[in-house]
């Protein structure tokens, strides 16, 4: 049995710069990983079967991104003659990241499966090839595949590696799940934030265009942010529902965590520019 990190991410900022004819929104965002997340346990099989041993409530196994990623890699590697005969896997997950939380849990799971099975099956696909596969599963999957903090543009697929400060974060989940379409379909969502260079953006105060909508539509998010803002700069990650506050030291973050209200599910983690998944491969 092998064990593989599936880390969370934060959007340190997120700006919506437009909307394409196909309905997808264009954006500029800054991804950084956390040293916290799910863990995937993978045991290779020799009969070509993919088994997910820990089903997710409300999600059929064949619809789960873990299974979809495994089957996609199997298909592409087989078609290109790079899949050893009988390659399969038993996969289980220790789930720590909430669904609909804006921490990238499902995308991270898919990326970990692609990277881990490519290694375990010895398929030999490059990171570029894996990232291309990942994009067909979700816009956030490539950044997890590539494994480095990044400035993202387009619909999130154009990635430029960056090295923002690795701060400590208190991340709080207010107990609601926010489906991404709920935010992106809101008529009041800002959709015309001017594009700026990464150098300019890094010098500005960070914010998230989705935050005003999430706070308006979900009182739990509004309450969580109102509480966090009493202690430190805080904002929404992704389309929510998780919010985070940044600190210079772990001790400062933990002092605030000790005061968290009971209705908040919160944890402290360090921002890291190299994904824990890729540290595992070094």
Curated annotation (Swiss-Prot):
Q: What positions does UniProt annotate as the active site of this protein?
A: 9, 140
- Which reactions does this protein catalyse? 4-CDP-2-C-methyl-D-erythritol + ATP = 4-CDP-2-C-methyl-D-erythritol 2-phosphate + ADP + H(+)
**Transmembrane residues, as ranges?**
none
Q: Which GO terms describe its biological process?
A: isopentenyl diphosphate biosynthetic process, methylerythritol 4-phosphate pathway; terpenoid biosynthetic process
Q: Which residues form the signal peptide?
A: none
Question: What Gene Ontology terms describe what this protein does at the molecular function level?
Answer: 4-(cytidine 5'-diphospho)-2-C-methyl-D-erythritol kinase activity; ATP binding
Which Enzyme Commission number(s) are listed? 2.7.1.148
One Pfam family, short name: GHMP_kinases_C
Which key words are in the record? ATP-binding, Isoprene biosynthesis, Kinase, Nucleotide-binding, Transferase
Q: Where does ATP bind?
A: 98-108
Extract the Gene3D superfamilies matched here: 3.30.230.10, GHMP kinase, C-terminal domain
Tell me where on the tree of life, at the top rank, the source sits: Bacteria
Q: In which pathway does it act?
A: Isoprenoid biosynthesis; isopentenyl diphosphate biosynthesis via DXP pathway; isopentenyl diphosphate from 1-deoxy-D-xylulose 5-phosphate: step 3/6
Q: How does it assemble?
A: Homodimer.
- Protein family: Belongs to the GHMP kinase family. IspE subfamily.
**Record function comment:** Catalyzes the phosphorylation of the position 2 hydroxy group of 4-diphosphocytidyl-2C-methyl-D-erythritol.
- What is the protein name for this chain? 4-diphosphocytidyl-2-C-methyl-D-erythritol kinase
Question: Which species is listed as the source?
Answer: Salmonella heidelberg (strain SL476)
């Amino acid at each position: 049995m092998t064990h593989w990190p599936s880390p969370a991410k934060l959007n340190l900022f997120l700006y919506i710069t437009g909307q394409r004819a196909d309905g997808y929104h264009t954006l500029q965002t800054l991804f950084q990983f956390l040293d916290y997340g799910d863990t995937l346990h993978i045991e290779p099989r020799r009969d070509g079967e993919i088994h997910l041993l820990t089903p997710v409530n409300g999600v059929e196994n064949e619809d789960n991104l873990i299974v979809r990623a495994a089957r996609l890699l199997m298909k592409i590697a087989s078609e290109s003659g790079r899949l050893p005969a009988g390659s399969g896997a038993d996969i289980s997950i220790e789930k720590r990241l909430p669904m609909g939380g804006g921490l990238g849990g499902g995308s991270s799971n898919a990326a970990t499966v692609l990277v881990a099975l490519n290694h375990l099956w010895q398929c030999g696909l490059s990171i570029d090839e894996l990232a291309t596969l990942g994009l067909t599963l979700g816009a956030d999957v490539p950044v997890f595949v590539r494994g480095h903090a990044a400035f993202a543009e387009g619909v999130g697929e154009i990635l430029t590696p960056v090295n923002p400060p690795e701060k400590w974060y208190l991340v709080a989940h207010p107990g609601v799940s926010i489906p991404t379409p709920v935010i992106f379909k809101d008529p009041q969502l800002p959709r015309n934030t001017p594009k700026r260079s990464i150098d300019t953006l890094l010098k500005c105060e960070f914010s998230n265009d989705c935050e005003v909508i999430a706070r308006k539509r979900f009182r739990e998010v509004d309450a969580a942010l109102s509480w966090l803002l009493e202690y430190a700069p805080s904002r929404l990650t992704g389309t929510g529902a998780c919010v985070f506050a940044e600190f210079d030291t772990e001790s400062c973050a933990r002092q605030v965590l000790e005061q968290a209200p009971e209705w908040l599910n919160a944890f402290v983690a360090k921002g890291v520019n190299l994904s824990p998944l890729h540290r595992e491969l070094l």
